[in-house]
Amino acid sequence: MKVIKVENQVQGGKVAFEILKEKLANGAQTLGLATGSSPLEFYKEIVESNLDFSNLTSVNLDEYVGLDGDNPQSYRYFMQENLFNQKPFKESFLPRGVKDNAEAEVERYNQILADHPVDLQILGIGRNGHIGFNEPGTPFDSQTHLVELDQSTIEANARFFAKIEDVPTQAISMGIKNILDAKSIILFAYGESKAEAIAGTVSGPVTENLPASSLQNHPDVTIIADAEALSLLEK
């Protein structure tokens, strides 16, 4: 596991973009993508570049259950606004947040992931150490599944909604096994609120109580983080 300390998210995006270019030069075909504020500067680097993504495939980590793709709070909408509209891929797959047939969607998405092995997976990390929407207690051998979101996750995401009652309580997420199946992984972490999770991810015991600690079992993980997120690691 490699840890790269950066000044801020802008520098973090540039560092990640250099890693991406190296992977593409070595034949990467499929990118695993994440939402949230952490990868935004990385996506800006992609959009502003002259790289052609029209022969590449993307798969996203997760999606809320109960939000249509045209809902501004859906992850599909986020990806369209921040990346896909400006830099189209050959194919871009996201879980569909269908409420009535979630189990069928789980099966569909697991098949997509089997058909499109991820070369480089992008991750953020939750305060409780979740990756994707894999909350504490998620088995490390899990594949795509329906998730009941932790209250801490709902509260963290409430800032994007008019009121906390509007935040979805379920999501469809890649499992931890799906994430670990990627050839390479970049995890972004910014801010003091992520410090405890990062300390456990890098140097704590590998435990299902901290989903991101599973990354210690992966051969090619790069953590890009600022001083605040690394503050407990450096003491």
Curated annotation (Swiss-Prot):
Entry keyword annotation includes Chloroplast: no
Q: Which UniProt keywords apply?
A: Carbohydrate metabolism, Hydrolase
GO biological process annotation, one example: N-acetylneuraminate catabolic process
Superkingdom of the organism of origin: Bacteria
A single MF term (Gene Ontology)? identical protein binding
Q: Which named protein is this?
A: Glucosamine-6-phosphate deaminase
Instruction: Write down the InterPro entries for this protein, in alphabetical order.
Output: Glc/Gal-6P_isomerase, Glucosamine6P_isomerase, Glucosamine6P_isomerase_CS, NagB/RpiA_transferase-like
Its function, per the record, reads: Catalyzes the reversible isomerization-deamination of glucosamine 6-phosphate (GlcN6P) to form fructose 6-phosphate (Fru6P) and ammonium ion.
Gene3D superfamilies associated with the record: 3.40.50.1360
Name of the gene: nagB
Q: Which Enzyme Commission number(s) are on file for it? A: 3.5.99.6
Cellular component aspect of the GO annotation: cytoplasm
Specify the enzyme's EC class, one word: hydrolase
